[in-house]
Structure formats: structure tokens, C-alpha cells
């Protein structure tokens, strides 16, 4: 193992768990966009500035976890901005079951409605329809990244009705003022998404932005079956290490609610998920020395060991389910229906 991990090009090394690593690789993060997964890293302990609640609907198996990052202490501990993070987990989302997807849409719509209410975005309070801009983030040409654009394909926009029939049209019919845009990715447009949205927001003056995006997860079991809703905005590309200008209330001037589904996971994270099984197998096979060595390394060191072995061979690869096209298509309907239910109520 020592020989395998030795790198002549980089003389500076550090010893982790009895194994020498390249110093340059020691600083890293296990990439995930899910606040729930960040919270799970410190499962069982109370974290100052973090509040967690969870509940499950037995009849549907839909599980909801609420992670609230309350202040700077929580922000530092979790690595997530202050805000509310709601995670809907439903294993049956992996199947094509229209009735079940509708149940998830209803649950998500209720959570979205509640989050809008927290920000004072209610027709009753405002005395007029809520003006909402839905943004479909991602690259429509790359299936795992096409969730946002797909949701926009199913969106029932209404803003144009005001332009055609008068500014009172939506209020009279009980409709929200709903518009949408798919800004593409920087490689296609040459512009940051935030730059595009600032122009659109200045012209259309929405009360809120709903940003839909594909996310990265740490665990394979969450791919395509987990939906995260957050009022902390969104940071395009952060889950795969591709940092872009953030889309937040501070940068755009209106509340930004993010809806995301993990569609990719890092190859090293997949291997990390199997370390426990590997350790057990090594011990059972009489290789207790190697098993004990890996077992006694903490999760961070295990992950670093895996990256040290894996990435020189294949690079920082990301993996997606084989039927991701079908999953993205189904989930795009689920999310678009949730948006319609939350904003139209019984008038959609």
C-alpha cells in the first residue's frame, strides 16, 4: 500500500492512518449538495446552531427531514448557508407509478406553500397574485443535468396572459403570475446564470424565484429518490466542484427557493459506501491486519485513501443510474405538478 500511494512528483506527503498521502490531496470535501447528508456526518450529536425534525407518512412511506441552519455556528458546522432545508425521501420514486408520484407532488407542494408563506408570499397577504419566476438550471443536452430544463417544459406559465388580457386577468381568475426561463450553462451562453437572471428580474419584477437544479449526493441510495427544498438559494455546480455565482436573495434581490434532486454521485463516494463491507470481508478472509487498519481510520481518512488510489487512474468521475433518462422525465413531472399545486391551488 505504501508503494502504491507513493508519488515521486510531489515530495510533500502526510501520514494518515499509517499510510503516506500526497500533501496536495489532504484538503478536500466529500461533495454533496444535500444538507441532510452533511448532518448525517455528525449523527447522534447535538450541533449548536442546527435544528433537526423528521416525520414519515406510514401510508405512503414518504419521509421528510427538516434541517434548519439557524446561525453562523450552524453554518460553519454544516458548511451550508443559514436557511431551511427540507428533504423528501421516497424510495418508490425510482418506479414509474403515476399515483405515487402524485402523492409526492402533493407533499412537496405543501412544503413549498409553507416556505412561501414564511417569506410573506401569499395572495391573501399581498392583495394580488404572487409573481413567481421559475428557473430551470442545467444543461438540457446532458441527461443527468437536464432536470431543470425538463421541469420548464411542463410549466404552465401565465404571465403572458396579463400582457395580452390586462394586468388584472390573473387576479380575476385566481391564477398566480408565473413565468419561467432556462438560462443554459456558461459554456453555451458565455454568461453567468446570475447575470442573466438579474436582467430578467429587473424587467419582469417577480416576488420570488424558484430554481430547479440537478444535485450531487454522497450516497448512491439517494439518487433520483430524494428531493431537497431550501430557502437558502442555490449555488450552481457546487456539488461537483464547479463553483459559480450563487443565486440567493442577496445576489438577486428577491427570495430564492431551490428545488433539487441528486442525479450523480462521485465514484470515490461510491467506493467509500462499500468500505464497511470491505473491512468485514478482509477480516473474515483472515486479512485482519488490513481490515483493522482501514476500520480504525475515520471516514475522512478512508475517503482520502480511496481518492488517492482511484483518481490517478480514472480522474474525478461522477456516476449516474443507468435509467437516468426515465427518472429525470418522471421527476420533472413530479416537481412541475408540485409547483402548480402550490401556486395555483384549486385553480390549476
Regions found by a protein language model. Give the residues of each.
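A structural-propensity feature for long, helix-poor, extended segments
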Residues: 170-200
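Glycine-rich phosphate/diphosphate-binding loop of Rossmann-like nucleotide-binding domains
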Residues: 139-176, 180
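Short glycine-rich or small-residue beta-strand-to-loop segments that form or flank ligand, phosphate
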Residues: 87-91, 131-142, 180-184
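A structural signal for small-residue-enriched, beta-sheet-centric alpha/beta enzyme cores
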Residues: 181-182, 211-348
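An N-terminal, well-structured beta->alpha segment
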Residues: 72-118
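N-terminal amphipathic/basic leader segments beginning at the initiator methionine
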Residues: 18-81
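Polybasic, lysine-rich low-complexity intrinsically disordered segments
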Residues: 9-13
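Proline-aspartate-enriched helix->loop->beta-strand connector
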Residues: 201, 206-207
